[in-house]
């Protein structure tokens, strides 16, 4: 393994293994952890495609692995699950831990342009550094066959990263994503601090803005949204994204679910549909 990449945890599940790793990120300038579920079929002679999962505010790389139950379907389909952390950690930037929705645990999957937050480059970490690290160190993974998914802030990350990198990912899905961050409080706070006042820069990290430019999609976008989600009306705004998709005939399946909230109970209920969605796009 590359210098500085070390395994820090391993548990068997559905005949595969959850493994956790630590490494020093050149992109972020700090030590980072990430988790991988290796399905039982994964080997150097039978490489597994990769589904990246981007988590939401306050989360680490462990939330999805521990709570979602995605390993059952991933084991069946032969998909590796890769879950990075949600921000740099341990940099001790003044104010980084003052609120749950900004700084530590709230990287918003962008490349910050403001000097104070210059290490917050989760976009480059997810799109460039992490795939390279995986391809160099895990012969049982096929990083050229990849899809991406996420929840809330991570759903925002999955949608924007997918739309800006249609050559790198076969499909995208999201649970309760922040689809129009330039028009919600979470997004406005994060973008103002990370990106400054340049609204054109904001739009590069807004799925509702991006779909008008990047819509030559080979796979339907799948979004699940709980109707009892406390953040649904004011922060997530999926109807705005739906309108933007309709304008350019972008294929979107937006499913609204009565009674479900913003939690991992909701994710666990429908995660199998998402794994199947990606398995189809990855031709498994």
UniProtKB/Swiss-Prot annotation:
> Known EC number(s)?
3.1.2.12
Modification N-acetylalanine occurs at: 2
Please give the GO cellular component terms listed in this UniProt entry. apoplast; cytosol
- GO molecular function of the protein, one example? S-formylglutathione hydrolase activity
Extract the Pfam families matched here: Esterase
Q: Would you tell me the protein name for this molecule?
A: S-formylglutathione hydrolase
Q: What does this protein do?
A: Serine hydrolase which catalyzes the hydrolysis of S-formylglutathione to glutathione and formic acid. Also hydrolyzes S-acetylglutathione and a range of carboxyesters in vitro. Involved in the detoxification of formaldehyde.
Question: Which organism does this record belong to?
Answer: Arabidopsis thaliana
Complex formation? Homodimer.
InterPro entries recorded for this chain? Answer: AB_hydrolase_fold (IPR029058), Esterase-like (IPR000801), S-formylglutathione_hydrol (IPR014186)
Where on this chain does substrate bind? 63, 67
**What residue ranges are annotated as transmembrane?**
none
Relate the activity to temperature as described in the entry. Fully active up to 55 degrees Celsius.
The answer to whether the entry has keyword Hydrolase is: yes
Keyword Acetylation assigned? yes
- Report the family membership: Belongs to the esterase D family.
> What is the enzyme's class at the highest EC level?
hydrolase
What are its GO biological-process terms? formaldehyde catabolic process
UniProt pH dependence: Optimum pH is 7.6-8 for carboxyesterase activity.
Q: What is the effect of changing residue 59 to S?
A: Loss of catalysis regulation
What keywords would UniProt list here?
Acetylation, Hydrolase, Serine esterase
């Amino acid at each position: 393994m590359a210098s500085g990449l070390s395994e820090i945890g391993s548990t068997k599940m559905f005949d595969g293994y959850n493994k956790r790793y630590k490494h020093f990120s050149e992109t972020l300038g700090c030590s980072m952890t990430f988790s991988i579920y290796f399905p039982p079929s994964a080997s150097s002679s039978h490489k597994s495609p990769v589904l990246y999962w981007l988590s939401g505010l306050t989360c680490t790389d462990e939330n999805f692995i521990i709570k979602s139950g995605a390993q059952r379907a991933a084991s069946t389909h032969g998909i590796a699950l890769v879950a990075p952390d949600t921000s740099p950690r341990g940099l001790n930037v003044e104010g980084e831990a003052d609120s749950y929705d900004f700084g530590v645990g709230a990287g918003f999957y962008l490349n910050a342009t403001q000097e104070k937050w210059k290490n917050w480059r989760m976009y480059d970490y997810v799109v460039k550094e992490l795939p390279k690290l995986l391809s160099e160190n895990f012969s049982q993974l096929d990083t050229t066959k990849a899809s991406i998914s996420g929840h809330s802030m991570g759903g925002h990350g999955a949608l924007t990263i997918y739309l800006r990198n249609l050559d790198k990912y076969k499909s995208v899905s999201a649970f309760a994503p922040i689809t129009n961050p330039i028009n919600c409080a979470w997004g406005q706070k994060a973008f103002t601090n990370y990106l400054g006042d340049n609204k054109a820069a904001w739009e590069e990290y807004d799925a509702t803005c991006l779909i008008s430019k990047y819509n030559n999609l080979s796979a339907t976008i799948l979004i699940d949204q709980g109707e009892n989600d406390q953040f649904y009306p004011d922060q997530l705004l999926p109807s705005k994204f739906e309108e933007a998709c309709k304008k350019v005939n972008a294929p979107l399946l937006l499913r609204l679910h009565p009674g479900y909230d913003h939690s991992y109970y909701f994710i666990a209920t429908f995660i199998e549909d998402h794994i199947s969605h990606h398995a189809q796009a990855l031709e498994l």
